[in-house]
């Protein structure tokens, strides 16, 4: 690892520890030339995932877009910022695991809806209204009815 001060490539590791919930390794290093101490992080390089849009175009998966859309759906709900970050991380992990370098944007949308439905019904309705392009009250009512029906089925299976 190159020293940020003198550019020497020889350093020794003073300390290593897990960081980012085990997704990276934090190393404290010391330059053998100038004794400057610095920190490095090592992460597994993830395979780039290409998103196939409805119009046939492709673009690289953008976690920030995912975060923005989910954050908007979760505004003024009991979903904390940390919970949103964890939710987005979980969706990203599923996308990387399930896709073979390519995934349709519709698959991402359905994956988000499936997971939001379990986590927060209000955020689910908000996201669904944009993703499924609700045209009026009827669309909201049918989605609410399906939520209501699934809640009854869950209660019946518990009883």
Curated annotation (Swiss-Prot):
Q: Is the keyword Mitochondrion in the record?
A: no
GO biological process, alphabetically ordered: negative regulation of DNA-templated transcription
**Segments forming unnamed zinc fingers:** 3-34
Q: Which cofactors does the annotated protein need, by name?
A: Zn(2+)
Stored InterPro entries? ATP-cone_dom (IPR005144), NrdR-like_N (IPR055173), RNR_NrdR-like (IPR003796)
Regarding protein family, the annotation reads: Belongs to the NrdR family.
**In its UniProt entry, what is this protein called?**
Transcriptional repressor NrdR
Q: Which organism is it from?
A: Prochlorococcus marinus (strain MIT 9215)
Query: Source gene?
Result: nrdR
